Amino acid sequence: VSNKKTEPLMEKIEKHLLLCDNEATSLQYEILAEQLPSMNQRIKDAYKNTREFVNFIHEVLPEAKINFVSKELAAQDFTPSVFSLDLPTKGSTDEERESYKRALNLKLIHLMITEIPNESKFCVSYGQLKGCYWTIPATSTQGTTKEGDKDYIVRASLSGNMDLEKHKEVFLEFVEGYM
């Protein structure tokens, strides 16, 4: 399965799968066949929630740096549900600013998890069916990366099935309490 932009890669992907004996099992194909019909809608819904949440963060915390897909790419159907958030920091030295930012990241994540425990999780998974996952890549997915190259930012992955208004409310509480 591919879109028009990835069609030229399909032959190379097939070759890789054959060489590495890494093709999906029959059970995996069955699961994919079951889930595929609703997958496109779930992707659209997750992107919609993520775009709305990112726009909200821009409104209430404009000095934050957010890495998220551009509207131009999204118009070409590249619609992820993951964004990175680099919170504004304080301090006189680089060390103070970095230390403050790391503590602030954890405060945000813990507040979201504490206030919305049924939907917000401290996790590295993406593409979930429900809720919102939060992580700091430097402490999870970048375990073998050199310390100086690690990203001490917040990364969030939203689904299409979550209480977006509650997440906005708690984020605003964070901004008003800590920023």
Predicted regions and their residues:
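Terminal helix/beta-alpha structural elements that buttress the NAD(P)+-binding lobe
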Residues: 166, 173-178
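Active-site C-terminal subdomain of aminotransferase-like
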Residues: 1-150, 159-163, 177
